[in-house]
Amino acid sequence: MNLELLDPFSIPDYPEALTTTLKHGHATSIRFSTNGYHLASGLVNGSVVIWDLSTFSVSRVLTGHTRAIQSVCWSSCDRFLLTASRDWKCILWDLRDGSIVYQVVLSAPVWSASLHPHKINTFVASLLDESPQLIIVDDGIPKHKYLPTNPDIDENYSDRRNRSKHVTLVSFFHPSGEYILSGTSKGWFHVIDASTTKIRSSHRITSQSIKQIRLSFCKRFLIFNSTDRVIRTVSIQDLDNPEVEHKFQDVVNRLQWNSCGFSQTGEFVFATTYQMAHAIYVWERGMGSLVKILEGPKEELVDVDWHPVFPCVASVGLDSGSIYIWAVEQKESWSAFAPDFQELEENIEYEEPEDEFDIHDETGKSEEEEYFTSVVKILPHDSSAEQPFVMPPTLSSS
């Protein structure tokens, strides 16, 4: 997409229609890269597909897992990708050549895994029916540190009786990398010190299980998805006292939610519905009002992600494994690129001047042939601290 030909004042804040469907294997989980150039898709057979969003073609296919991919996580530089699978393994991939940097075999199937924001050799993993682990890989040798699940406060009798059933379902790093944020099956939200693996603070967000926690692009808010059918947004500017801002739910139908997240600006939140609804709900975060219901596929939508730059949403179909993309159908404004360009409402008859197609001299013709016109323009990156990683193309002979 050529950004210079788009009218910035005509772009809405959220997608409006289903525009593209991607299909390569049966997808289970997806994530956009931090710069928005690529989309990582984990498949049910253990493969990982990297999509090029400029051409909607496959850039790489990574094979290393033997069972379904549970989660994919990009590094901050977009060069590395961490994948977690039901085969009890986590693999870090180098997308420059598709090689494996390291792989770690854990003690149980992995719910999800999240990279450290600044260190690619450190990640945290949430395991099935076991305590989460902080893994640090030094010289190819992983060091495991178990993270706590139960809060360091007095619990009532029923909580003590069901202590064995209290497990961590989701965990990831704070943007600073100093803390690990986790959610449990009893609705507890923990802030864990990454250096000491001790709980700094615990807060009861809900009485039901916390299925998912996502971080906003501005790194100041969290969105919680729990089994009580309520989506909550929480401010984490003060980690010792997180504040629940808004609650989103379908009061009439009492829908359960599969996945949720923030828009790229943080002004909207979205969630996919469970079972029969086949839609994505979009709310305005400030007012809490429902602004859009994205429909189209005739199947349940599981994982969902919002593009980091454009108002674009990608989601995975449960039955077919296809990737559906909702976006805004943009009309390129050539007058924004060339001020003297005139747009016509309808065709007009053109009167040809007598000398328009006269033969020019050979000197002018040779100068035109020697003049090189670039048809590809790479826009500069906003960050001056580090140039973004650009994945080299993979040429395959058919």
From Swiss-Prot:
InterPro entries: RBBP5/Swd1 (IPR037850), WD40/YVTN_repeat-like_dom_sf (IPR015943), WD40_repeat_CS (IPR019775), WD40_repeat_dom_sf (IPR036322), WD40_rpt (IPR001680). The keyword Repeat applies. PROSITE patterns: WD_REPEATS_1, WD_REPEATS_2, WD_REPEATS_REGION. Component of the Set1 complex composed of ash2, sdc1, set1, shg1, spp1, swd1, swd2 and swd3. The gene is swd1. One of its GO terms (cellular component) is Set1C/COMPASS complex. It comes from Schizosaccharomyces pombe (strain 972 / ATCC 24843). This is Set1 complex component swd1. Pfam families: WD40. Its main location: nucleus. It comes from the Eukaryota. Keywords: Nucleus, Repeat, WD repeat. GO terms for biological process: transcription initiation-coupled chromatin remodeling. Gene3D superfamilies: YVTN repeat-like/Quinoprotein amine dehydrogenase.
